[in-house]
């Protein structure tokens, strides 16, 4: 029997061992040994906890030039992301990508709603004239989603300010033919041109009004500050905003057809910050040509290309100028691409290989598909992705499109893949977002690569996203990393270790041997 060692030498003894416990990420993801892996096939080994979970920073790169406070992104699917989802994803620190299975005008209007939701100084406020009718003002309220409009002599910015019209001024006015000048609030409180944002917010706190109008020395309207924006700043400290305009960040998707060029022009005009080139197989001449055109036509617009699952696919898109990559093929809960097309790759292996390659060129990657819980998100980030795109996890939330319905006593919402027949036939035209995404716009017989279904009501993302945020912080704490940057660095250096899971190990790691149980994710 070997002699018992002195307990004081335990740390030194671990240093003398031939190798650390567990596997490095390179050893884990060796396809020659283990084949293709997905998130359930491995675990991350725990590290040293010497900090509180609240200290963990989840700040990350979405693209080369856009940084988010949380690594969570909503998918551009027509049952997941429209203006409401995109708005609250941005307020909560992530970003939403508005789908394009709709008219270009409708999509641009959704982008505009997000951009108008929160501002710093509103340098281009919507202005009306004294002769605008109450009915027209009410219509503008419906169109823009708010009702605080400055009134100038000619209805234009940089003209003399004569009043302001608010929802209180018109809410109970039944005669829509009345003119704004008859019901508006005159002599509103103003601030002098040149005040700082913090000074303007202090004035708003003191005057207890809905907005502060900024004028020059001649009384001409220059810009505006909103009290609701001040409140949102307090309620949503992690919000994703443009560094220049202080508006919420908003993304959208487009296809790779010529018609999508005009769509993009409308989106950029509406204030779009980042665009996804939406294709199930991003390594195509169509996407490469579109990518080059976008970078030439809108050099300031960030472009995320994809989808890809191999280094070779990624190389073509990086060389064409992609600012970010989207990884995944056939791994979503509503996707049947791997089954039907025999193409794709297990998501863990795809994320690791593409990220390892793309990170050498400073191109952030987004893991898209196969994510079912906080653990999966943590694993995707550990394998190298900068953000994680969620479709099914956000479907069924209050902010997702569609109406709730009841089936077998359960409250449900529709959720479908963009490769489903329902999505392909949504607009009644062959060349819609769904068919172009799967290269099917000219097919007489549509081949589905997705299914249509329903998901249970998940409540609001205003509770769900903070749950994911706190869960990710706790995951990083268990691993022993104070930030996502440190997590990635320690994975590459071999300090963060992994373990491969057998089928029995996966069974052991789940709930088992209970007669019944309730799985509550958060309070």
UniProtKB/Swiss-Prot annotation:
GO terms for molecular function: chromatin binding; IMP dehydrogenase activity; metal ion binding; mRNA binding; nucleotide binding. K(+) binds at residues 330, 332, 335, 508-510. Its EC number is 1.1.1.205. Signal peptide: none annotated. Coiled coil: none annotated. Keywords: CBS domain, Cytoplasm, GMP biosynthesis, Metal-binding, NAD, Oxidoreductase, Potassium, Purine biosynthesis, Repeat. It is an enzyme of class 1 (oxidoreductase). Residues 121-183, 184-240 form the CBS domain. Catalyzes the conversion of inosine 5'-phosphate (IMP) to xanthosine 5'-phosphate (XMP), the first committed and rate-limiting step in the de novo synthesis of guanine nucleotides, and therefore plays an important role in the regulation of cell growth. In contrast to the other IMPDH alleles IMD3 and IMD4, the enzymatic activity of IMD2 seems to be intrinsically drug resistant. Homotetramer. Seems to be able to form heterotetramers composed from more than 1 of the 3 IMPDH gene products (IMD2-4). This is Inosine-5'-monophosphate dehydrogenase 2.
């Amino acid at each position: 029997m070997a002699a018992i060692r002195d307990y004081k030498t335990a740390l030194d003894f671990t240093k003398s061992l031939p190798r650390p416990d567990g596997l490095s990420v390179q050893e884990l993801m060796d396809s020659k040994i283990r084949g293709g892996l997905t998130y359930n096939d491995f675990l991350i080994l725990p590290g040293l906890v010497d900090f509180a979970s609240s200290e963990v920073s989840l700040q990350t790169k979405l693209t080369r030039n856009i940084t988010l406070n949380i690594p969570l992104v909503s998918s551009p699917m027509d049952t997941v992301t429209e203006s409401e989802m995109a708005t609250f994803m941005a307020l909560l620190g992530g970003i939403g990508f508005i789908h394009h299975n709709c008219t270009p005008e409708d999509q641009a209007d959704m982008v505009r709603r997000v951009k108008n939701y929160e501002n710093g100084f509103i340098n281009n406020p919507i202005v009306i004239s004294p002769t605008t009718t109450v009915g027209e003002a009410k219509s503008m309220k419906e169109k823009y989603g708010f009702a605080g409009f400055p009134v100038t002599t000619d209805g234009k910015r940089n003209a003399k300010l004569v009043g302001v019209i608010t929802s209180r001024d018109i809410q109970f006015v039944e005669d829509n033919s009345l003119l704004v000048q008859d019901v508006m609030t005159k002599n509103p409180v103003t601030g002098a041109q040149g005040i700082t944002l913090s000074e303007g917010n202090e004035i708003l706190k003191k005057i207890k009004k809905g907005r502060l109008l900024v004028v020059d020395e001649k009384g001409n309207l220059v810009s505006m500050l909103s009290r609701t924006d001040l409140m949102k700043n307090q309620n949503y400290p992690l919000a994703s905003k443009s560094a220049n305009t202080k508006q919420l960040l908003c993304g959208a998707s487009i296809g790779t057809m010529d018609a999508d060029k005009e769509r993009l022009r409308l989106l950029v005009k509406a204030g779009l910050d980042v665009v996804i080139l939406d294709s199930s197989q991003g390594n195509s001449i169509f996407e490469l040509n579109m990518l080059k055109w976008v970078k030439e036509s809108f050099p300031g617009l960030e472009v995320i290309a994809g989808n890809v699952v191999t280094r070779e696919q990624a190389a073509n898109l990086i060389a064409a100028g992609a600012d970010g990559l989207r990884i995944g093929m056939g791994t979503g809960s509503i996707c049947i691409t791997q089954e039907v097309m025999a193409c794709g790759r297990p998501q863990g292996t795809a994320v690791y290989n593409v990220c390892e390659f793309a990170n050498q060129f400073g191109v952030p990657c987004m893991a898209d598909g196969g994510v079912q819980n906080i653990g999966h998100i943590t694993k995707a980030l550990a394998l190298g992705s900068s953000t994680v795109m969620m479709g099914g996890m956000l479907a069924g939330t209050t902010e997702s499109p569609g109406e709730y319905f009841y089936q077998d006593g359960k409250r449900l919402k529709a959720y479908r893949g963009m490769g489903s027949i329902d999505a392909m036939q949504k607009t009644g035209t062959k060349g819609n977002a769904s068919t172009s995404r799967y290269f099917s716009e000219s097919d007489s017989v549509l081949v589905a690569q997705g299914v249509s279904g329903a998901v249970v009501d998940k409540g609001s993302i205003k509770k769900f996203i903070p749950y994911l945020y706190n869960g990710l912080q706790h995951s990083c704490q268990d691993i022993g990393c104070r930030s996502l940057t440190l997590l990635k660095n320690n994975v590459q250096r071999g300090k963060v270790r992994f373990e491969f899971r057998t089928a029995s190990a996966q069974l052991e790691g789940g709930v088992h041997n209970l007669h019944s149980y309730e799985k509550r994710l958060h309070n």
